[in-house]
């Protein structure tokens, strides 16, 4: 067989293979379609049907040619979906493992935040009103969330709980407890100031119903009491407790 003939046969083989490949890609969705999208994992806020519909709209190709990277991104665009893992299951199934975000608190006006400080905003979804509220810059979410969890655990040990935790752009920290009392921690030494409150929490509650506990002093705090607090226990509605030093 001459060199020219071998070259011609090589070209013909490449054309045949190329044509076959083109035909396969063209007809593969028909010959090997994805007939079932199987959702696994805990899907509380987006039903399996809703996620299936989103993936079906985005699906192009069959079991061999479907773009799993694109489908993964589509699944993770749903606000509650933290991570999606997709794999092909022969002959006609796409299996999707879903891990949803699990919020521990509301975040500012329209968001939720996870224990890791990941902020997400369900578009058109309901925000659970029974969760505590955290407020601050999104960039500080990991720090705020970590402090919320640590402080909540410490407060629970003295029978208290956090309803709202906020930090403003100046770094001024405030806590509102489930009892209605507000703690002013200021911008510095916030851990020490909270510890000061914890050490006196029982005595404060025994003395009356504090509305505001201002801990922004170098040594001590001031208390604003509820109007109906027993006047026999205290001398003045704005009595200062263990106050010393300048407020910061």
UniProtKB/Swiss-Prot annotation:
Q: Which organism is it from?
A: Allochromatium vinosum (strain ATCC 17899 / DSM 180 / NBRC 103801 / NCIMB 10441 / D)
The protein's job, in short, is: Essential cell division protein. May link together the upstream cell division proteins, which are predominantly cytoplasmic, with the downstream cell division proteins, which are predominantly periplasmic. May control correct divisome assembly.
Compartments it resides in:
Cell inner membrane
Give the quaternary structure: Part of a complex composed of FtsB, FtsL and FtsQ.
Gene Ontology biological process terms, A to Z: cell septum assembly; FtsZ-dependent cytokinesis; intracellular signal transduction; lipid metabolic process
Cite the entry's keywords alphabetically: Cell cycle, Cell division, Cell inner membrane, Cell membrane, Membrane, Transmembrane, Transmembrane helix
Its record classes its membrane topology as: Single-pass type II membrane protein
Any one GO CC term of this protein is:
cell division site
What PANTHER family does the annotation carry? CELL DIVISION PROTEIN FTSQ
User: Mostly located where?
Assistant: membrane
The identity of this protein, by name, is Cell division protein FtsQ
Q: Which domain of life is it from?
A: Bacteria
- Segments in the Periplasmic topological domain: 26-248
Residue intervals of the POTRA domain: 32-101
In alphabetical order, the GO MF annotations are: phosphatidylinositol-4,5-bisphosphate phospholipase C activity
Give the Cytoplasmic membrane side ranges: 1-4
Record-stated family: Belongs to the FtsQ/DivIB family. FtsQ subfamily.
């Amino acid at each position: 067989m001459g060199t020219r003939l071998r070259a011609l046969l090589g070209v013909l083989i490449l054309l045949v293979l190329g044509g076959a490949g083109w035909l396969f890609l063209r007809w593969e969705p028909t010959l090997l379609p994805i007939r079932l999208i199987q959702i696994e994992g805990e899907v509380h806020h987006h039903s399996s049907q809703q996620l299936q519909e989103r993936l079906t709209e985005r699906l192009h190709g069959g079991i061999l040619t479907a773009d799993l990277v694109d489908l993964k991104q589509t699944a993770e665009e749903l606000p509650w979906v933290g991570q999606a893992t997709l794999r092909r299951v022969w002959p006609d199934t796409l299996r999707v493992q879903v891990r949803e975000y699990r919020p521990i608190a509301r975040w500012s006006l329209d968001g939720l935040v996870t224990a890791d400080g990941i902020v997400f905003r369900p578009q058109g979804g309901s925000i659970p009103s029974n969760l505590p509220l955290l407020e601050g810059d999104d960039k500080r979410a990991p720090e705020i969330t970590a402090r919320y969890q640590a402080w909540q655990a410490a407060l629970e040990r003295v029978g208290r709980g956090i309803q709202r935790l906020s930090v403003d752009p100046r770094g001024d920290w405030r806590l509102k407890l489930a009892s209605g009392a507000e703690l002013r921690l200021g911008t510095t030494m916030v851990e020490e100031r909270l510890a000061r409150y914890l050490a006196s929490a029982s005595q404060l509650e025994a003395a009356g119903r504090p509305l505001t506990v201002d801990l922004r002093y170098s040594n001590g705090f001031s208390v604003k009491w509820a109007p109906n607090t027993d006047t026999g226990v205290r001398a003045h509605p704005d009595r200062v407790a263990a106050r010393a030093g300048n407020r910061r």
